[in-house]
């Protein structure tokens, strides 16, 4: 139904009247609505849903259940770095539940008043992010993608370390399997995107991936990276364990299949597991996929994309 709506206002009206997103979108005026406003509300709803489950997590395993906070903090730090480099000031438009806000490693609101890289480093000097940021020369223009890559690597390292610290046996194995699969699917999608749109060198592609978490054989990853183009990437994937069986379609289509694989894996674990950490991780994945799907629909309608294309994103 949603993909066949004609305007963003119609999408919001449907979500308000027919779904559990009514409360999240209650303050949006359907006659004067823009995509960014909806995305902010959907992101807030995601964190609220996760926070509801976090409240019941064992105190001893709290580090694991709060892994989403690291992602929030990294996004805010990156936003601040970009604004400082562009010499622009703006207010952050992210609202997270009070329960989560109390668990952050720094006061999010205070970031707004920071006016220099020096002040930012000083402010974050007691956090896990300092060891990454202190290595960057902010006296010259920096590579935003490289900085984000370093912080994202820190994010994954922290989750892996936390899982190994708090869980053992099959629970640890299953949690790592879900995480590594998620990272690998992102790697695969990124390789395809580079081949389809940017024609980057093999070294450039390799440096943008988190290969330390790959579950595909090393030879397969090397062949994907060195593929002559998107068609060869798809051909190689059709012989892998993921078995995409895709013909030559645009990137949104491969991303759709990557999300489908992650969705089915998460759904299976949630259905058959009685392990609280597994249920929480899979729940957060399923919620994120649902939120992202809604964002894709809004974006597709905003740019007047065909229904068939929206449905394959």
Regions found by a protein language model. Name each.
Residues 1-313:
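N-terminal domain-start signal
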């Amino acid at each position: 139904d949603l993909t066949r709506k004609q305007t963003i206002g119609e999408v919001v009206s449907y979500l308000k009247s027919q779904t559990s997103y009514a409360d999240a979108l209650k303050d949006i005026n359907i006659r004067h609505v823009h995509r960014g406003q909806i995305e902010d509300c959907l992101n807030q709803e995601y964190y609220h849903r996760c926070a509801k489950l976090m409240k019941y997590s064992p105190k001893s395993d709290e580090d694991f259940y709060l892994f989403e906070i690291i992602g929030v903090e990294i996004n805010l730090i990156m936003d601040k770095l970009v604004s400082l480099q562009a010499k622009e000031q703006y207010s952050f438009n992210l609202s997270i539940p009070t329960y989560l806000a109390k668990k952050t490693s720094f006061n999010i609101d205070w970031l707004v008043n920071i006016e220099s890289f020096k002040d930012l480093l000083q402010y974050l000097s007691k956090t896990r992010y300092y060891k990454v940021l202190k290595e960057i020369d902010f006296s010259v223009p920096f590579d935003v993608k490289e900085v984000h890559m370093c912080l994202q690597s820190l994010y994954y390292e922290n989750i892996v370390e936390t899982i190994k610290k708090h869980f053992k046996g099959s629970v640890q194995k299953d949690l790592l399997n879900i995480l590594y699969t998620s990272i690998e699917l992102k790697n695969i999608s990124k390789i395809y995107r580079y081949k389809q749109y940017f024609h980057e060198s093999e070294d450039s592609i390799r440096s943008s991936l988190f290969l330390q978490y790959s579950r595909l054989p090393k030879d397969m990853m090397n062949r994907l990276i060195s593929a002559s183009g998107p068609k060869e990437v798809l051909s190689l994937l059709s012989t892998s364990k993921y078995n995409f069986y895709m013909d030559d379609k645009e990137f949104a289509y491969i991303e759709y299949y990557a999300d489908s694989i992650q969705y089915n894996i998460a759904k299976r674990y949630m259905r058959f597991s009685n392990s609280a950490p597994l249920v929480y991780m899979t729940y957060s994945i399923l919620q994120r996929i649902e939120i992202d799907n809604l964002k894709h629909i809004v974006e597709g309608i905003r740019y007047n994309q065909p229904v068939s294309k929206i449905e394959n994103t």
